[in-house]
Amino acid sequence: MEYYYCPRLLKFLQYLWDQLKQCFTRQPPEAKDTDTLVQEPDSQYGTWSEQRRSGDSFVPESPSSENDAISTRKQPPNSQPSSLSSQTEPTSLADRCDFSKDQRSTSLDRSSTDIDSTDGTELPPPGDAYPDGKTTDFSFIDQTTILDSSALKNRVQLSKKRRHRAPLSHSLRRSRGLEYENRFSLTEESGSTWMFKDSTEEKKPMQQEDSDEEEKTQRSGRLSSVQAQRLPIFPGMDHSVLKAQLRKRHESESPGEPSSAQPFKSPKPQLGTPGSRILPSSVEKEERSEEKSPQWLKELKSKERQSHYENQV
């Protein structure tokens, strides 16, 4: 690893270290009464003139400027001397800020010279802190080996092939099967006939071979159709004899159908649905009630019937 030397950073760190030393080496102030503190407001932080006399590197801002600004705000606007003082104050404040900046820069320069003297080596100017001549060498990248991703590519291809495909239609299967059969037949013929051909025989033209093949296919188709037509259903029996026997059976069964159908009829009356109940008629109800009822009820009922009939008439 190469380390770069940054003088500015070192100067800043040295400056902070000096400030910390000053903070810890200061003597604690003596205990004073509150009256003395009130009478001496600027003695705690120090006035501007005292700080200017003392050559400290760090110059804090004096609170006297703030007190002057507060006093100017409190004064009424009608007073002329206050207006004059307000005009002169901004310039004095700007001069003080410029002076404090100059003093800080001088203190930083002093601290940098102290560091240079302690190291014993002369540092280059700040412009040459990062030399452009040194460039990083990236030649080691070419020496590295590239990862072999062929196995991953093969896995991806296999996963694509294993995906579920839609089933082929019946017509496509037939057409493909015929193509494969034709290819195999051509290869078998070419492989089996070339060994037994006689070179002295005359070769037939292509048209004659095609016509011979067409005639063979037509003959085979005709033979298959004739054989399918001539195949009997019951071998060893004539069609005419079978037809005559079937006609006789139909004629004998046609007049005997009603007689044969009668014994199969059930004498029981057809009932409705198995879940339905048939209510008894009114006459049956009256007969049952007459059988169970006493004599005086029977007489009353007979009288009611007679009166009912008379009213209807």
Swiss-Prot record:
**Where is composition skewed (Low complexity) in this entry?**
80-93
Organism's domain of life? Eukaryota
- A Pfam family of the record is Tankyrase_bdg_C
**Which residue ranges have biased composition labelled Polar residues?**
62-77, 105-120
What's this protein's name? Uncharacterized protein KIAA1671 homolog
Where is region (Disordered) located?
29-136, 188-313
Sequence ranges of Basic and acidic residues compositional bias: 95-104, 198-207, 283-313
